[in-house]
Regions:
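C-terminal catalytic "cap/lid" subdomain
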Residues: 1-148
């Protein structure tokens, strides 16, 4: 297993707002040839949620945003976002699937709140960008499938 973000600068990022957030960034580019070569050689790339600015500053990146950017860049068929809950919950039950329209409705109803909002928002954007499915779930890979 190789950690690539620190060694080969696989991820280029832009500062979100240096004065407000400090060294926090958003993905601007993924060096896909390095990742594709590893995958072609049956290797599993492991990326830290770190990117580098054009000036060489190391920037923290939200892990879900990085994962979705990599999935889009690699034209992945599926992305699994691991979390500490079994999936998107409604009344304590895991939803089997969720569309972008249902996502907004459930936010408006107060069903989806807090840290799950940016996770699902990035998942919805990933599906809309062409990744076939995003699964949000726990280490047992039960979960909620985000579909278009």
């Amino acid at each position: 297993i190789q950690l690539l973000s620190n060694i080969k600068r696989v991820v280029t990022a832009d500062f979100l707002d240096k004065e407000t957030y400090g060294y926090v960034g958003d993905v601007s580019h993924i060096q896909t040839p390095i990742l594709e070569q590893m995958l072609d050689n049956q290797m599993l790339p492991v990326l830290a949620s770190i990117g580098y600015s054009k000036e060489g500053d190391m920037l923290n990146i939200n892990a879900d945003y990085l994962a979705t950017a990599v999935a889009i860049a690699l034209n992945a068929k599926k992305l699994v976002l691991m979390t500490d809950v079994k999936g998107v919950l409604e009344n304590g039950e895991v939803l089997d699937s969720l569309t972008s329209k249902e996502f907004q409705e459930k936010i408006d109803q107060g069903i989806i709140t807090g840290g799950m909002i940016p996770k699902i928002e990035s998942a919805v954007n990933t599906v809309l960008a062409g990744v076939g499915e995003v699964l949000i779930g726990d280490n047992l890979v039960t979960g909620t499938s985000i579909i278009s």
